[in-house]
Amino acid sequence: MTQTKIDLPPAFPDHTQLPESDGTFVKNFQEHPQSIILTDSIGPVLQQLHPDGDYAIGQDCGIYWRETEPPEKGAEAPDWFYVPNVPPLLNGEIRRSYVLWRELMAPMIALEFASGNGDEERDATPLSVWAEGETTKPGKFWVYERIIRIPYYGICEVKNSKLEVYNWLNFYYQKLQPNERGHYPITPLGVELGLWHGTYQNQTQYWLRWWDSEGNLLLIGEERAQLERQRAEQERQRAEQERQRAEQEHQRAEQAEQKAARLAERLRAMGIDPDSGQIE
């Protein structure tokens, strides 16, 4: 019996060998500061949800969802995403990409910061393979909805200060409506997502921010430190006011004591015992 030699394709690269970029530029100066705000402010929430530290946050990192050649054609890179219940490091190394079929855990939420009108982020073009072997590049929306199945997908139009959030339900994305605060509840995290106008890293504009379920803004480290400084200053002022009140009370007591002593001295000069009131 003749054995036929079959050449197997090479193994798919691991996360340290896969391309870290598809060659496109970061689309605007807001993108990286925006990612920092989201990661910094959600940190305390994720630490409570994952006391073991098993979660990962990707910022403009590739999610490889199919094997292709070149590999980056089978990847999408959300501007920000969070994956629960996976280690932040792989074999002690910093993650450089996320290979979906090896992790077996989809991101809980993915966010895109659209510089334009968001058409690219809403592209639902399906993957198609032609008879000639050519493929049609699928749209992000289709990949997130039909393949990766990310439960929450947010599109923030930076230029228009507009936010849309979709929830994966019954195999399709349903567009959510904001609550009375104009926020979108992300129920598994116990937080809300919305737009906040303010200044960060010398840029005053609308930023994508988190709030807790009661509508309190989740602060970044710089804001938390500033709040602590304000609290410390208020405590210092309160202590100083208390010290001044105590000093004033002490002065009043001394003045009353001195007044009583002077009165007693005058009474004695008149021949009256100040203690009994009798004439000596």
Specify the residue positions occupied by each region the protein language model found.
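C-terminal interaction segment
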Residues: T2-K27, E31-H32, P44, P70-E72, ...
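Acidic-basic catalytic patches of nuclease active cores, encompassing PD-(D/E)XK
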Residues: F29-F81
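Proline-centered loop/turn at the N-terminus of a beta-strand
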Residues: A56, P151-Y152
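Protease-associated
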Residues: P84-V86
